[in-house]
Amino acid sequence: MAMLGLLLLASWALLGALGLQAEARPAPYGVKLCGREFIRAVIFTCGGSRWRRADILAHESLGDFFADGEANTDHLASELDEAVGSSEWLALTKSPQAFYGGRASWQGSPGVVRGSRDVLAGLSSSCCEWGCSKSQISSLC
């Protein structure tokens, strides 16, 4: 009788451990992300560390930019006059219709923009419904 009780106890412990292991297993498709959580995951995956790195590099490059308190203002004024006279500045001061040749930018080829938008919408809805992996999210980068 003691042997039967010990056998039942061992089988109960084994089944309990298997049940806990099954509950701890992640979903087969990854993590379910909907709405704002999905967008945050895309931003974190695609640009999080890159933006932080760019901020650090910009801070390092500007470190000794303001070290000299007495800047040569005549030199800066001539650079400003040169920039205002450039074709890039003139392009910025034109109206959008003149810059784009009278055609609004959305009237071009919408297939490319719409195609990438459809991929994003499809992945976001499937990620919300079934879940998605980090590699699927990084495919949007």
Curated annotation (Swiss-Prot):
<dbReference type="GO" id="GO:0005179">
    <property type="term" value="F:hormone activity"/>
</dbReference>
<comment type="function">
    <text>May play a role in neuropeptide signaling processes. Ligand for LGR7, relaxin-3 receptor-1 and relaxin-3 receptor-2.</text>
</comment>
<keyword id="KW-1015">Disulfide bond</keyword>
<feature type="disulfide bond" description="Interchain (between B and A chains)">
    <location>
        <begin position="46"/>
        <end position="141"/>
    </location>
</feature>
<protein>
    <recommendedName>
        <fullName>Relaxin-3</fullName>
    </recommendedName>
</protein>
<keyword id="KW-0372">Hormone</keyword>
<dbReference type="GO" id="GO:0005576">
    <property type="term" value="C:extracellular region"/>
</dbReference>
<feature type="disulfide bond" description="Interchain (between B and A chains)">
    <location>
        <begin position="34"/>
        <end position="128"/>
    </location>
</feature>
<dbReference type="InterPro" id="IPR022353">
    <property type="entry name" value="Insulin_CS"/>
</dbReference>
<dbReference type="InterPro" id="IPR036438">
    <property type="entry name" value="Insulin-like_sf"/>
</dbReference>
<feature type="disulfide bond">
    <location>
        <begin position="127"/>
        <end position="132"/>
    </location>
</feature>
<comment type="similarity">
    <text>Belongs to the insulin family.</text>
</comment>
<feature type="propeptide" description="Connecting peptide">
    <location>
        <begin position="54"/>
        <end position="117"/>
    </location>
</feature>
<dbReference type="InterPro" id="IPR051777">
    <property type="entry name" value="Insulin-like_neuro_ligands"/>
</dbReference>
<dbReference type="GO" id="GO:0001664">
    <property type="term" value="F:G protein-coupled receptor binding"/>
</dbReference>
<dbReference type="InterPro" id="IPR016179">
    <property type="entry name" value="Insulin-like"/>
</dbReference>
<keyword id="KW-0732">Signal</keyword>
<keyword id="KW-0964">Secreted</keyword>
<feature type="signal peptide">
    <location>
        <begin position="1"/>
        <end position="24"/>
    </location>
</feature>
<comment type="subunit">
    <text>Heterodimer of a B chain and an A chain linked by two disulfide bonds.</text>
</comment>
<dbReference type="Pfam" id="PF00049">
    <property type="entry name" value="Insulin"/>
</dbReference>
<keyword id="KW-0165">Cleavage on pair of basic residues</keyword>
<dbReference type="InterPro" id="IPR022352">
    <property type="entry name" value="Insulin_family"/>
</dbReference>
